[in-house]
UniProtKB/Swiss-Prot annotation:
Taxonomy, superkingdom: Bacteria
Gene3D superfamilies: Glucose-6-phosphate isomerase like protein, domain 1, Helix hairpin bin
SUPFAM superfamilies assigned to the protein according to its UniProt record, in alphabetical order: Ribosomal protein S2 (SSF52313)
Sorted UniProt keywords: Ribonucleoprotein, Ribosomal protein
Organism: Ehrlichia canis (strain Jake)
Regions of compositional bias (Low complexity) in chain numbering: 263-277
Listed name of the protein: Small ribosomal subunit protein uS2
InterPro entries linked to this entry: Ribosomal_uS2, Ribosomal_uS2_bac/mit/plastid, Ribosomal_uS2_CS, Ribosomal_uS2_flav_dom_sf
Length: 291
């Protein structure tokens, strides 16, 4: 039995998931997911969001249950810290600084950079090294630069089995690479997004911190549930474990407790300012899309 995280329509409303962009900025391909317009702001139909979010979480659960790798991608300022925190919390991988062209389609070259990053880490951590302070500072500078770009995937060990993306417009190169390699893509789609190439679309606000936090957290929780199910099948008692990181080594899962971080900013940004007075009951009726 699949035990997916529970959420309600109120959770979506309180997270500001229903707020789209100004009507003038919309992508017509998102019309099926739009409920209407309020104060020149497109409002997302949360009935669609509920159904599609459940579909996406079920697909994600199935991938992780088979010990597949999940890559979180979100490089915009308001998503960066959340993407890293939630990927780490569930033991998965992330890109939160800048997507380097070829990260998927040219994995062999990226693997060489990962190898170089690990070499720098060993050099710096080796207390018996014979390098001067100046040389060590140079190594640290190079290590830090690589870590910003590929630190979140340095232990991935191969291509991911599924992508979870915040802001498909900004991360369009990553999506194209995934499509080329037939890697499924789960993505939050705002009203200005292009749903083309997205296997599991989730209509929702991809700009506000609270909305991003909601989606990243529920994705992370789903991954943790799948890992718990996998561990339970192996006879491991996982009762009471809520947050733990998971590392994959030779198809075995090793778990360790990890402190949950609570340093996220809860302020909304961009497309939430003009529709704060909308009531929950206004969002769950039939579709009234704009043509």
């Amino acid at each position: 039995m699949v035990n997916l995280p529970k959420f309600t329509m109120r959770d979506l409303v309180e997270s500001g998931v229903h707020f789209g962009h100004k009507a003038s900025r919309w992508n017509p391909k998102m019309a099926p997911y739009i409920y209407g317009v309020y104060n020149d702001i497109h409002i997302i139909n949360l009935q669609n969001t509920v159904v599609l979010l459940k579909n996406a979480l079920k697909a994600l659960y199935d991938v992780v249950l088979k010990r597949g790798r999940v890559l979180f991608i979100g490089t915009k300022v308001q998503a960066s810290a959340i993407i890293a925190d939630e990927a780490i919390r569930c033991g998965q991988y992330y890109v939160n600084n800048r997507w380097l062209g070829g990260m998927l389609t040219n994995w062999e070259t990226i693997s060489l950079s990962i190898k170089k990053l690990k070499e720098y880490e060993k050099l710096i951590e080796n207390v018996d090294n014979q390098f001067t302070k100046k040389e060590l500072l140079l190594f640290e500078k190079k290590r830090a630069k690589l870590d910003r770009s590929i630190g979140g995937i340095c232990n991935m060990g191969g291509l991911p089995h599924v992508l979870f993306v915040i802001d498909t417009n900004k991360e369009h190169i990553a999506i194209k690479e995934a499509n080329k390699l037939n890697i499924p893509v789960i993505a939050v789609l705002d009203t200005n997004s292009d749903p083309t190439g997205i296997d599991y679309p989730i209509p929702g606000n991809d700009d506000a911190v609270r909305s991003i936090d909601f989606f990243c957290k529920i994705v992370s929780d789903t991954i943790l549930e799948a890992i718990r199910s996998d561990l339970a099948k192996s006879g491991i008692n996982v009762d009471g474990i809520k947050d733990f990181s998971v590392e994959k080594r030779d198809d075995l899962l090793r778990t360790s407790n990890r402190d949950n971080k609570n340093n996220k900013n809860n302020n909304n940004t961009d497309n939430t300012d003009n529709a704060a007075s909308i009531k929950e009951e206004d969002l769950i009726g039939g579709s009234n899309n704009e043509n």
